[in-house]
Curated annotation (Swiss-Prot):
A GO CC term assigned to this protein in UniProt: ribonucleoprotein complex
Protein name from the UniProt record: Large ribosomal subunit protein bL28
UniProt keyword Transferase, yes or no: no
GO molecular function, one term: structural constituent of ribosome
Keyword Cell membrane belongs to the record: no
Stretches of the chain forming a coiled coil according to its record: none
Family listed: Belongs to the bacterial ribosomal protein bL28 family.
Entry-linked NCBIfam families: L28 (TIGR00009)
Keyword tags: Ribonucleoprotein, Ribosomal protein
């Protein structure tokens, strides 16, 4: 799966989009991913990280 966070493994989820008239349509939600350079085991590496992990400080950014 390409749209997965490399830190927390958050990926696509599916469910129903419900209109005002209560009609149901299947849809998917994707995580808000950003490509960042992060320090992994002392070396910089390019990762796909969700914004929740970026904001909570789970990723050490490389400069």
């Amino acid at each position: 799966m390409a749209r997965v966070c490399d830190v927390c493994q958050k990926g696509k989820v599916s469910g129903n989009q419900v209109s005002h008239s209560n009609r149901h349509n299947r849809r998917t939600w994707t995580p808000n991913l950003r490509k960042v350079r992060a320090i992994v085991k002392g070396t910089p590496k390019r990762l796909k990280v969700c914004t929740r992990c970026l904001r909570s400080g789970k990723v050490e950014r490389a400069l």
